[in-house]
Amino acid sequence: MASRTVAKDIITLRGSAAIASEFFGYAANSILYNRGVYPEESFVKVKKYGLPMLLTQDEGVKSFVANLTAQLSEWLEAGKLQRIVLVIMSKATNEVLERWNFSIETDSEVVVKGVSREKSDKEIMREIQAIMRQIASSITYLPCLDEPCVFDVLAYTDKDVAVPFTWIESDPKLIANPQMVKLHSFDTKIHKVDTLVSYKNDEWDEQ
């Protein structure tokens, strides 16, 4: 009698945390490249998510992103991370020009009981692809950043989380009267990530 083996795509808490934290690393690189925060020649092209992606070769930024993704993975696995915000600011004035907001919903049953979920890697990759394509085309819906900029990353965690000394308390770095663009989301069935970018509305200032 013929038998058939059916493979299931099992997503564990640790696996989901790895997917989401890796996504944040690639998304941060893509934002810094596409928004011109760092020069084009300081990035190299790699293939990820079935797409050409850009990674910084700036040692300071590489180290920052590596430490960031490691910490995010730890918080995601503990179910303690609520939101990550990449903030782009004017280098001269520190005025906040853009906020790339990634809000995270965590399946608490998985964290508490250690159960797993099912979703195919291909489906998750397709959802991430859609977000990465939107970041890559951000020049079509965001105003040009025509001044030198710097960036920072804010993490919103549960109050009881242990925070490393390398992280400091911060104000939310909000934008007054921002314009907002909602991007796609992805869901590992354990961590759901919604993406929203808000930016300074110069037209409002001129009225």
Where would I find each of the regions flagged by the language model?
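Long protein-protein interaction modules used by eukaryotic assembly/scaffold proteins
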Residues: 1-57, 62, 71-207
